[in-house]
Amino acid sequence: MFVEGFRVESPRVRYGDGEIESEYRYDTTEVVAPPSPEKGWVVRPKSVTYHFKTTTTVPKLGVMLVGWGGNNGTTLTAGVIANREGISWATKEKVHKANYFGSLTQSSTIRVGSYNGEEIYAPFKSLVPMVNPNDIVFGGWDISSMNLADAMTRARVLDIDLQKQLRHHMESMVPLPGVYNPDFIAANQGSRANNVIKGTKKEQVEQVKKDIREFKEKSKVDKVVVLWTANTERYSNVVAGMNDTMDNLLASLDKDEPEMSPSTLYAIACVMEGVPFINGSPQNTFVPGLIELAIKKNSVIGGDDFKSGQTKMKSVLVDFLVGAGIKPTSIASYNHLGNNDGMNLSAPQTFRSKEISKSGVVDDMVSSNAILYEPGEHPDHVIVIKYIPYVGDSKRAMDEYTSEIFMGGKNTIVLHNTCEDSLLAAPIILDLVLLAELSTRIQLKAEDQDKYHSFHPVATILSYLSKAPLVPPGTPVVNALAKQRAMLENILRACVGLAPENNMMLEYK
């Protein structure tokens, strides 16, 4: 059964004026190393009471996209307008209605309990108050000056009938000049770069900060979230004395250090303005000095790289195989695509960023099972991406998984996945900005703490949506998709005093 919404009645939950307060018992385990080899490990159950406070006043949200005129930016903007205006359009198959399919927050459900033996589900977004995506105000930057209506046509993602209905909404949307450094992206992007911020790197950062303030004032929004959906950059060199600490990073900015990428400059500007910044590409935007700066300023950062198609499947399948006691020994992943992302990734230095992002997705699953894998052992894992213009945004992903099974047997799984690249990425961008905003309205404290505090500024709450999740120093990296979703859902359940969904169903046993 499906219900549109619910209210929690519990002595541990209080719905107040503009906030929800909850008391939550966090049950976990503490592992103690043996004092000597002959004594075994000890596991101790541990309970800590946390108090959550969630502001329920939903702000008017502005979203600024870096690379607003690209395929992802135009597709998301067009999709939100189509939903807001209730647009429908005809194709040769049928008449379609605007929707938010592919969005975790808007189109998925959570189990809230059972009634007369039937499980009850509610919208994910009903857990706590969230921004309505139809109310988002969009803006952003792009190194191309093309308006969003023409950029939408250039992208070749949306059906023509839909484009015609959206054109008059998007013709007046023109990106602000963007930060451009040809050393960090493929040379083939130079022909687009007619809309760039001039000056030194420090001057560029100041301009981005000014752009954010002016956008917020002009659009009359309460909060702004900035997200990078521009070209994949090459990896930046992390060098002692340059970007390894906050002080060195800021000194390098003053010195106009060449090895500071555009994405890092945007991130610095956002942290300085106290605006959440999310990196949707695989490069190492968040160099150590930038992470230190974000922590000091308590400004939200998250990423890296949208987890939308092939990698999402991989994070499910390998988790299943290893969890079933099957040993993946070889993973071969091949992609070809024809959009501008594929064109940019045809350069070796930018492809390397994507290769690193995609390769690490199975690491935590492999390291979880020392029965299958010896120390240091890892599946052979190769990733290939090729640019084929004709297929456009319709990316093809082909994977072969070879595994060892019972008594020396072999198992091979082959997948062919046609990923409509931007149509998969756009709702993920939507979820990222909505959850980043929501995270700024949640505070918590443990039972031995006097004051509430916000989540750590390195936003692990966004891990489900990221190929290479950014985590605070010393925090385990989790890539398995089911674990990531459970973490996100259970944190929001805690905000309203609900127990985590453990699927034990003891009442029926």
UniProtKB/Swiss-Prot annotation:
Superkingdom of this protein's organism: Eukaryota
Required cofactor(s): NAD(+)
One GO cellular component, as annotated: cytoplasm
Primary residence: cytoplasm
Pathway assigned in UniProt: Polyol metabolism; myo-inositol biosynthesis; myo-inositol from D-glucose 6-phosphate: step 1/2
A biological process from GO: phospholipid biosynthetic process
Protein task: Key enzyme in myo-inositol biosynthesis pathway that catalyzes the conversion of glucose 6-phosphate to 1-myo-inositol 1-phosphate in a NAD-dependent manner. Is a key enzyme in the phytic acid biosynthesis pathway in seeds.
Protein name: Inositol-3-phosphate synthase 1
